[in-house]
C-alpha cells in the first residue's frame, strides 16, 4: 500500500515543486507556545527576487545550521541561489536581533525532490554563534528507538488543524508539542515517522527538529494528506541515517563515507490506507 501511496505522492509532489512560490510547509498543530527557544533553534529566511520563504533549522556547530534540503533547494529568476539569513535562539519573531548571514550551503548530493530522499542540508554562517549546539545521535541510533515513545517538536508553522495550503499562515511565537513515534517504513529508507490525531507539524515547520531525550533524531520533511493533524504520521529525515555524511562534511571524521546506511525495522502505518494521500511539503513561502 505504501508503494502505491508513494507513486501518488511523487506525482503530486512533482506538480508542487514546479512552482515553489506556491509551496507551503508545516507548522505545529495542537502544541503550546514555548516559554523560550532552545539556544540552538534557528529561524531561517530564504529570499529570492520571486519570494521570501521561511523554514527552521538547528545549530549543530558554531557556524553550521542543519535544515531540510527542500527549504533551500530554490533559485531566483536568473537561476541564482537564494539569500539566507538566520536568527538563533529567539522564540519571539516580533523582536529580532541582527540576523546571521549564510555564505554557503551544502545540500546532500543525492537529494531527490520527487521522493524526498536526502532531504537534508547544511548552511554555513559567516560569523560563529557562541551558544549551545543541539545534540546529534550516533549512526543509525534511530533503529533502537521503541515505537510509542513521545518525541518533541518545535516550530513557527500553522497551528490550526484542517487548514489547507492556501489558507495557511504562520505564528511569530515558537510552538512546541509532543508527538508519538511510529518508526520506519521501507518505502522511505531515510525517514522516521511521528504524529498524532490533533497534533502535528504543519505548513511552515519545514526543517524544524524532532527530538527525544534532548537528542535530535529528525528534521521536519513532509506530511501526507492535504491538511495537518489528521492522525497520519508525518515524515522526518532520519538524522542518524546521515551521521557519517554530517561528520565528513564538517570534518568531524576522517572517513569519506557518503552517508550511513539506514536503520532497519518496518512500521505498520495502518492509517495510511486512505483513498488518496498527498505528499505535503512542510515549507511556507510568503510575499
What is the predicted function of each stretch?
Residues 44-45, 65-68, 72-110, 178:
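Conserved H-D interstitial segment of serine endopeptidase catalytic domains
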Residues 47-50, 70-77, 89-94, 126-131, ...:
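Acidic glycine-/aspartate-rich tracts in secreted/extracellular proteins
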Residues 5-14, 275-277:
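Bacterial N-terminal signal peptides
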